[in-house]
């Protein structure tokens, strides 16, 4: 009978077997726990109409094209616009049940109420998307591994560290000397990235990269941008990685590792020598106070330490510089907002710039919040269900009934759409209005840094650094003008970065 399995019939046999496995998996997932969910009032959620409802590769390919074509934000908005009668719906995403939502209560459940039922390891660590860049770290681990990663970095994100403006000042002073003459058009985004690379390298490694003086030292920044851009693409298309050429991404990973390895190896060697001298009763120099040194004392394994450092240094180096660029993008297009910021800065006078002062500047903080709202660095909040759980909303035709979520399902809250929901923000939800934050209270409808125990540990540090830079720029320049007629188009990295840069001109 073996001759029957010829070159024509064999592919069909394989296809049939794969189809049977997928259908069996979906049947078992649907059948499991049905009576329990009915007892809790759960109803099935609306489902996205797909041309490929069995395998679910259509939406994966569509998303991959959007990412590579720099239309990801538009793709997300169009996806939700296609389901106008509900804030929550599901799709078959490469064989997984993927639940999309813009419901704040679902974000609350994932981050707080049902935190123990959700995690990130199944989507960030087990698929090969992020490897060989990094494996375990604070943003890829759950349970004890996550607790350990958090312990590694927590001392450096305490209040005594993030409130310091003295740490920022010398780098901001240098940055100001590099800005061009009045009226000259320039792209401020690369300069912001060099500025932040210098701050971050001193904070993490104890020694600044000094890329504002030596521009060639910023090359690792562009490699990190490629690592983040490719990492997102690989994580979201991990089931069809074979369909794309990733040579450019592996080259970027190699460059980043090549940058970090000397720091890590020299630190481990210095630590070993110090411990030996202490053991021998010999005098030692004063202990280093940078983050890498602190991490190395708790994790002296080179490969594991590099993974942890990668997942702090690379995303952290991108986030703040992009965010300040977004702030300036909007301010250059809203002269009244710049004037109001200038008025608030002028009212302070010559008082020293402190964390408390910046936190109390209402309009400045309105600018930060409004920028987070319109261009959130964290576009989606994605979690995998680690166990069966019932969410308070999302079921039924309008999404108002409880929703049964099974182990292995993916829940994705689309913040870039939720933050523009007219039901929450009013008819001007798409408009830039920093004043809307005057008197507005926070809540689960707006969490730029996440919430609950897993919120971003660098939240206050990012806010302080961003506010400080905007304060200094408003203090120096009377006018900011947009010199790029292009609308904002996002190139996705850790978050959306302006594809056309941030081309502006300043006037004193």
Curated annotation (Swiss-Prot):
Keywords of this entry: Iron, Membrane, Metal-binding, Monooxygenase, Oxidoreductase, Transmembrane, Transmembrane helix
GO molecular function: heme binding; iron ion binding; oxidoreductase activity, acting on paired donors, with incorporation or reduction of molecular oxygen, reduced flavin or flavoprotein as one donor, and incorporation of one atom of oxygen
GO cellular component: membrane
Cofactor(s) the protein requires to work: heme
Main location: membrane
Record's subcellular location: Membrane
A Pfam family it matches: p450
Residues noted as binding heme in the record, renumbered to the chain: 456
TM spans (from-to): 8-24
Factors inducing expression: Expression is positively regulated by the cluster-specific transcription factor tenR and is induced during cocultures with the natural competitor fungus Metarhizium robertsii.
EC number(s) reported in the record: 1.-.-.-
InterPro entries, per database record: Cyt_P450, Cyt_P450_E_CYP52_ascomycetes, Cyt_P450_E_CYP52_fungi, Cyt_P450_sf
Membrane topology: Single-pass membrane protein
Pathway annotation from the record: Secondary metabolite biosynthesis
SUPFAM superfamilies: Cytochrome P450
Disruption phenotype: Fails to produce tenellin, and leads to the accumulation of 11-hydropretellenin A, 12-hydropretellenin A, 13-hydropretellenin A, 14-hydropretellenin A, 12-oxopretellenin A and prototellinin D.
Entry's family note: Belongs to the cytochrome P450 family.
Record function comment: Cytochrome P450 monooxygenase; part of the gene cluster that mediates the biosynthesis of tenellin-type 2-pyridones, iron-chelating compounds involved in iron stress tolerance, competition with the natural competitor fungus Metarhizium robertsii and insect hosts infection. TenA catalyzes an oxidative ring expansion of pretenellin A and 14-hydropretellenin A to form the 2-pyridone core, leading to the production of pretenellin B and pyridovericin, respectively.
Protein name (record): Cytochrome P450 monooxygenase tenA
Species in which this protein is naturally found: Beauveria bassiana (White muscardine disease fungus)
Lineage: Eukaryota, Fungi, Dikarya, Ascomycota, Pezizomycotina
């Amino acid at each position: 009978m073996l001759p029957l399995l010829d070159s024509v019939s064999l592919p069909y046999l394989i296809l049939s077997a794969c189809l049977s496995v997928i259908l069996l998996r979906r049947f078992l997932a649907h059948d499991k726990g049905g009576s329990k969910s009915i007892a809790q009032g759960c109803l099935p959620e609306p489902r996205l109409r797909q041309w490929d409802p069995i395998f679910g590769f259509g939406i994966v390919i569509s998303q991959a094209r959007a990412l590579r074509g720099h239309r990801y934000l538009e793709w997300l908005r169009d996806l939700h616009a296609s389901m106008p009668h509900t804030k929550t719906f599901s799709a078959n995403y490469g064989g997984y049940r993927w639940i999309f939502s813009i419901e704040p209560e679902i974000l609350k459940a994932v981050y707080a109420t049902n935190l123990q039922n959700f995690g990130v390891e199944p989507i960030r660590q087990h698929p090969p998307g992020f490897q060989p860049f990094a494996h375990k770290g604070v943003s890829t681990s759950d349970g004890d591994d996550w607790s350990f990663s958090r312990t590694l970095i927590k001392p450096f994100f305490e209040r005594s560290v993030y409130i310091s403006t003295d740490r920022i000042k010398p780098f901001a002073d240098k940055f100001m000397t590099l800005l061009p003459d009045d009226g000259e058009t320039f792209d401020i985004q690369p300069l912001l990235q060099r500025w932040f690379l210098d701050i971050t390298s001193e904070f993490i490694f104890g020694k600044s990269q000094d890329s504002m003086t030596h521009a060639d030292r910023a090359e690792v920044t562009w490699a990190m941008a490629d690592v983040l851009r490719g990492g997102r693409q690989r994580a979201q298309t991990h089931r069809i990685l074979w369909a794309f050429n990733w040579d450019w991404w592996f080259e970027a990973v190699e460059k980043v590792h090549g940058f970090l390895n000397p720091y890590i190896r020299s630190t481990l060697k210095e630590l070993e020598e110090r411990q030996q001298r202490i053991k021998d009763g010999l005098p030692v120099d004063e202990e280093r106070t940078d983050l890498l040194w602190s991490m190395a004392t708790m994790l002296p394994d080179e490969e594991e330490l590099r993974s942890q450092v990668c997942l702090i240094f690379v995303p952290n180096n991108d986030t703040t510089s992009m965010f300040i660029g977004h702030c300036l993008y909007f301010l250059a297009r809203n002269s009244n907002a710049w004037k109001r910021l200038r008025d608030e800065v002028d009212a302070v006078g010559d008082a020293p710039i402190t964390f408390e002062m910046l936190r109390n500047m209402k309009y400045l903080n309105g600018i930060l919040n409004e920028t987070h709202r319109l261009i959130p660095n964290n576009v989606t909040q994605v979690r995998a269900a680690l166990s069966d759980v019932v969410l308070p909303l999302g079921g039924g035709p309008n999404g108002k009934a409880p929703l049964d979520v099974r182990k292995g399902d993916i829940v994705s809250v689309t913040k870039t759409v939720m933050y523009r929901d007219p039901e929450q923000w009013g008819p001007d939800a798409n408009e830039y209005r920093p004043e809307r934050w005057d008197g507005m209270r926070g809540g689960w409808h707006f969490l730029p840094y996440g919430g609950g125990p897993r919120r971003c540990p660098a939240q206050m540090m990012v806010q302080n650094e961003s506010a400080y830079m905007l304060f200094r720029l408003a203090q120096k320049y009377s006018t900011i003008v947009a010199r790029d007629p292009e609308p904002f188009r996002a190139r996705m990295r850790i978050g959306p970065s302006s594809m056309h840069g941030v081309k502006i001109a300043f006037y004193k």
